């Protein structure tokens, strides 16, 4: 079994990984859970980029990532197994521990749910998957990558605010967000509670038209 450690986590290959039915023993991991109970983690984003951790601002994104890793790794967060495809179609399996990526990506996607429309989320995810596949298959210099990057950058213009997570040993959960771009707050009303933009008769007409179109 061998391991590769970097800024974005540690990959673990060989040994039990070669058996699709086997998991990894505790000894395979470099970082272990040393905390009990729970605590909240606040990650603040500006245009989709991580800018603050627990309200501490970072000009250097690398230091911000390292701070999240330090906090999350103490709970043993970020352990999982990845199965991927090579360019020639052979599948590979690798274990990993990556507290910072799991927490940052989880917080970012949670914030996107509040600040992007349904179709912005859908197409951003579709394009992001293609971008990841092209990048994995050494197509970074393909001109379409610049087009995809422009779309992804545009999609993040309103992804601003703080996502709040609750950390527990070996896992985390989402709590809420604080954002001036929160689309849950709107002038028409509150979902499941009340509305201010139309009457009951308007709703009946809308249902009738859409159900017969």
How would you describe each model-predicted region?
Residues 3-213:
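Nucleotide-activated chemistry modules centered on ATP-dependent adenylation/adenylyltransferase
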């Amino acid at each position: 079994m061998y391991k590769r450690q970097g800024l974005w986590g540690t990959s673990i290959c060989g040994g039990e990984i070669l058996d699709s039915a086997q998991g990894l023993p505790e000894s395979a991991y470099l970082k272990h859970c040393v905390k009990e109970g729970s605590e909240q983690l606040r990650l603040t984003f500006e245009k989709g980029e991580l800018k603050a951790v627990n309200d501490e601002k970072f000009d250097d994104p690398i230091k911000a990532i390292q701070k999240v890793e330090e906090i999350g790794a103490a709970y043993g967060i970020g352990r999982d197994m990845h199965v991927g495809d090579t360019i020639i179609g052979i599948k590979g399996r690798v274990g990993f521990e990556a507290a910072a990526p799991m927490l940052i990506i989880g917080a970012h996607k949670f914030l996107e749910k509040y600040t992007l429309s349904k179709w912005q989320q859908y197409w951003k995810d579709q394009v992001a998957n293609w971008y990841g596949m092209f990048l994995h298959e050494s197509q970074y210099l393909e001109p379409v990558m610049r087009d995809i990057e422009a779309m992804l950058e545009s999609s993040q213009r309103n992804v601003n605010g703080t996502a709040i997570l609750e950390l527990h040993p070996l896992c985390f959960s989402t709590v809420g967000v604080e954002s001036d771009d929160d689309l849950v707050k709107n002038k028409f009303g509150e979902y499941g509670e009340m509305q201010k933009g139309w009457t009951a008769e308007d709703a009946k007409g809308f249902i009738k038209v859409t159900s017969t179109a």
